[in-house]
Amino acid sequence: MSDLQAKNDVVAVDRQSSSSLADLDGPSPLRKMISVASIAAGIQFGWALQLSLLTPYVQLLGVPHKWSSFIWLCGPVSGLLVQPSVGYFSDRCTSRFGRRRPFIATGALLVAVAVVLIGYAADFGHSMGDKIDKPVKMRAVVIFALGFWILDVANNTLQGPCRAFLGDLAAGDAKKTRTANAFFSFFMAVGNVLGYAAGSYTNLYKIFPFTMTKACDIYCANLKSCFFLSITLLLVVTIIALWYVEDKQWSPKADSDNEKTPFFGEIFGAFKVMKRPMWMLLIVTALNWIAWFPFLLYDTDWMGREVYGGDSKGDDKMKKLYNQGIHVGALGLMLNSIVLGIVSLGIEGISKKIGGAKRLWGAVNIILAVCLAMTVLVTKKAEEHRRIAGPMALPTDGIRAGALTLFALLGIPLAITFSIPFALASIISSSSGAGQGLSLGVLNMAIVIPQMIVSFGVGPIDALFGGGNLPRFVVGAIAAAISSVVAFTVLP
């Protein structure tokens, strides 16, 4: 998120790295770690495009607004299944190319395939019989959904082995490990900013004029162009890293039993011995993600639909309004990423001043709740302005600034959400008798399961209240407020 998958790879990282530290004679030079970490920029570029542009694209293809969240189920499902599985098998990979490089290369190639399917879904669908004037382009939707799921699986195939490769290169050196992961986070921020900047540029398709076709309008052509840049960046940094950095072939030791316990078997076993502090952490984390997930999926759609008053299924003027809002929303996400990066650098100092991690988490959840609730005010102001100035009127500078301010402010609680829960899980694990990897694995379930619940639940809620994004944001605000209270009162 950006991002959503950065959290889902924690489980695989701990497990993969721990079994490979002895395979290298010593830590590798920092320049090699930076080369591997740079792959994160390519990965996150694609994730930024997913979060900012793909939900509106789904609706342009004709998927009803209330059902589009089901397509996003791939994120939590693949985070729950793919990353741990990839970690499990990469630990045991005996390829002459090394443990991690085969999975990283496979993930990059799958991303390329997925990008072609997603970007050309409308064209493929049209060539297979979809009518341009029909609101639902079923063949294009099927092709898009296939490409979308492949993209999520591919990104998950990349994330875990990349972080595990950094652990291998650090070879047990704690300082090098922290430095390598810091660079990985840095390149994630770089990818986010690049992705959101590309998504906010409305004339990108002019660089690739062939992207605009009879079945693919300007918005669709811009999406294609963004993904072409994304896959180019990813392939370049991946090829450089895999060529430059050696990944030694692994052979199991003769005296090793090479245990076959499934990864999830170990995670579920941790529930039997889990103590109260960990349960409280899981509750706060789950509530936190119930709050976050609707906004992370529908933030740019909210900007295009509620703030700008556009409609992805309306006439050309309404579509133009909607597209303008989407691109301003992408700018908001770029501001969000910048704030997130800045705040992340100061979390430790802020935590000390405010009185500890749980107080900091509780405080920023209040910010999250207020910001989500304020989307209602911004929406009502935009609707009032359109009633006075006309339905095609653009939002005033004040309304637009208010919406962008919410995007930026939400970078503060997002930075805490990406760090504090995992730090608390590590602290709790040291006194509970559970290993850090198991604790983080259980915490990961408290992230992806709420995402699935939200994916199934927000559609009916929206339909019950007449459609739009505000009902899900209000539910998120309530969940954030409850999460704040629980964090202040029951966290250790």
Curated annotation (Swiss-Prot):
Gene name linked to the record: SUC8
Gene Ontology CC terms, in alphabetical order: plasma membrane
UniProt tissue specificity: Specifically expressed in flowers, along the transmitting tissue and at the funiculi.
Species for this entry: Arabidopsis thaliana
Molecular-function GO terms, alphabetical: sucrose transmembrane transporter activity; symporter activity
UniProt feature coiled coil, ranges: none
Main location: membrane
Disulfide bonds: none
Residue intervals on the Cytoplasmic side: 1-33, 90-101, 161-181, 246-277, 346-359, 425-444, 491-492
Residues that bear Phosphoserine: 17
UniProt pathway: Glycan biosynthesis; sucrose metabolism
Function comment: Responsible for the transport of sucrose into the cell, with the concomitant uptake of protons (symport system). Can also transport maltose at a lesser rate. May also transport biotin.
Regulation: Inhibited by protonophores (e.g. carbonyl cyanide m-chlorophenyl-hydrazone (CCCP)), but not by SH group inhibitors (e.g. p-chloromercuribenzene sulphonic acid (PCMBS)).
Record field: catalytic activity: sucrose(out) + H(+)(out) = sucrose(in) + H(+)(in)
Protein family membership: Belongs to the glycoside-pentoside-hexuronide (GPH) cation symporter transporter (TC 2.A.2.4) family.
GO biological process: sucrose metabolic process
Extracellular side: 55-68, 123-139, 203-224, 299-324, 381-403, 466-469
Protein name: Sucrose transport protein SUC8
Name of one Pfam family that matches: MFS_2
